[in-house]
Amino acid sequence: MASAKPALLFLIFALISLTILTIFWNASSIQREAVPLVATTVVRGPSLLVFPISNSTGDPAQGIFADSLTEDLIGALIRFRNMRVFGADNTIHTLAASTSRDNERATTAEYVLKGTAGQFDGQLRVTVTLMDGKSRRYIWSNTFQRDFTPATLADVRQKISAEVARKIAQPFGVVYEEEARASADQKTNMLSSYECMLRTYQYWRQLTANLHAQARTCLERAVQVDPLYAEAWAALALVTADEGRLGFNRSSGRPDPIAKSMQLAQYAVALSPDAPLPLRALGMSYWLQGEPHLGIATYERAFSLNPNDSDLLAELGRCYSLIGAWDKGVPLILEAYARNPALSGWYHSILALYHYVHGRFGAALDEAKQINVPESVLPHVSLAMIHAEAGHPAEAAAEVEKIQSIDPQFADNAQASLERLNLAPDTLSRIADGLRKAGLFGRAQREASEQW
């Protein structure tokens, strides 16, 4: 029996390998192109060295709190997969100040994080500073003060750590802005795989067909240069999905972008099963294939891996809201915008829909005007139905003209297009009411829409 175990293990390994290769065969059907030699140097993100948080009180008993804060901070930072986080030796804080400065100067990390912490009169006070690891330039600093009791000390400490991590490491955070600025003038075909991810986040922030094309081209090259970069495969899956979801840059070579997106997402998850972005891509693929509960379960799994991810929080809010769980979904979107105001305006479409189905047309219009995705038909659908219900016929008619300009067949395909959003039945019915009032439908279409 003992001799059978190696054979069994080999068989299991072979089956797993075959599965990954099969997915890769499907995913790797991306058209190949010449890759500049400069792109063969793969950079997966900058490095961040976290120095131990110093005890600012002079009370040795508070050193334990500072050490625990350092550990919490590193733990929160490593949940983001867009930088390499290193912790300096915890004995450094026992060295003389001059020795500490020598250690800082000696680092090769792109960024250095340092700070102080202490407890004063029932308050925690934490000051954190981010510096350029090479030039020693100060990039960002903030002080966090929170009330606490002995019972809430650990919870408050962890919340401060999470807030610092989001400020620094999340998309559109401090490090993202620094890195994006550094590569802003580079041509797409000269970007590293990590820099392609920066461009993709720029697209997710400003959803336009031009940025979509740039992101797709860059990511297709990135996965050739760096085929084990799970996040790049996941980003490519999400960008490919937008060909069908938003109608951006449809390709005759991809007649079914949603199915292609699923293949890419599955491959990304096979490469890195515990990475949030691949799971987010898989969740989106399930959602677009009409399996909303599988999509939500996958998003929940991704969010459990990084509860500090504002994008995942907003995606969960979007999904719960569209299936009719407004009480659960809307607070998640509001929390996501509170955490990261630079999130895409796309999620305002969900808030607009929330107010619309509850008859608050003024509030719905305020939200819809913030969507800012003019090249997609869906924001104009929102504005058309809201204006119609609010008693603005001229504005509703203008939005109908924009819908017809972007997609002349939308009125014919409206039911199928909207059902792909996995809308709750009463929500779909309210949308149909608004679009009829807006004048989108001809007679036959109007009669059909009454059965939605």
Describe the role of every protein-language-model region.
Residues W204-L207, Q224, W287, S321, ...:
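Hydrophobic/aromatic side-chain positions at a characteristic register within alpha-helices
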Residues S261-Q266, A275, R280, L294, ...:
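Alpha-helical protein-protein interaction modules
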Residues L211-L228, D256-S272, T298-E300:
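Amphipathic alpha-helices of TPR/Sel1-like and other helical repeat/solenoid scaffolds
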Residues S29-D67, I74, N189-M190:
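A structural "domain/chain start" motif
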Residues I20-L37, T70-Q214, C218:
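Catalytic-center loop of serine/cysteine hydrolases
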Residues N189-R205, A234, P276, R280, ...:
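Alpha-helical tetratricopeptide repeat
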Residues Y201-A209, A237-S252, Q289-G290, G324, ...:
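Short coil/turn linking the two alpha-helices of tandem helical-hairpin repeats
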